[in-house]
Amino acid sequence: MTMFRSISMVMLLVALVTFISMVSSAASSPEADFVKKTISSHKIVIFSKSYCPYCKKAKSVFRELDQVPYVVELDEREDGWSIQTALGEIVGRRTVPQVFINGKHLGGSDDTVDAYESGELAKLLGVSGNKEAEL
């Protein structure tokens, strides 16, 4: 029984080390580097797919605030699938859209709409959230 337990522990340890090395290598992949560089280089970044209704909704929120996000349309890139995988490893979600403001992850479409409706998005961007108030 002790021998079986020792073998099980060794197998578990090997599996854990393998998993950690896979995650580490993915987190430092060219695609992960692209994601990180893009996020740090632009005030507003949306990782999107051109046909996605949730992505369109998130982009429309920024139009309402007269803001122009930097949009990465994953379906229009040869490396889009790999970028989406790297994005999922970085933020814990593979779904699109994924929105970043000032280098920080805001979330997806619902998170973006909620932040807009609460006024938090306007605060993060340093803009007025009420167009009528600007008149």
UniProtKB/Swiss-Prot annotation:
Subcellular localization: Cytoplasm
Transport listed as a keyword: yes
Alphabetical list of Pfam families matching this protein: Glutaredoxin
Residue stretches making up the Glutaredoxin domain: 32-132
Highest taxon of source: Eukaryota
Keywords: Cytoplasm, Disulfide bond, Electron transport, Redox-active center, Transport
Transmembrane regions listed in the UniProt entry: none
UniProt function note: Has a glutathione-disulfide oxidoreductase activity in the presence of NADPH and glutathione reductase. Reduces low molecular weight disulfides and proteins.
Family: Belongs to the glutaredoxin family. CPYC subfamily.
The protein's name: Glutaredoxin-C4
Natural source organism: Arabidopsis thaliana (Mouse-ear cress)
Gene: GRXC4
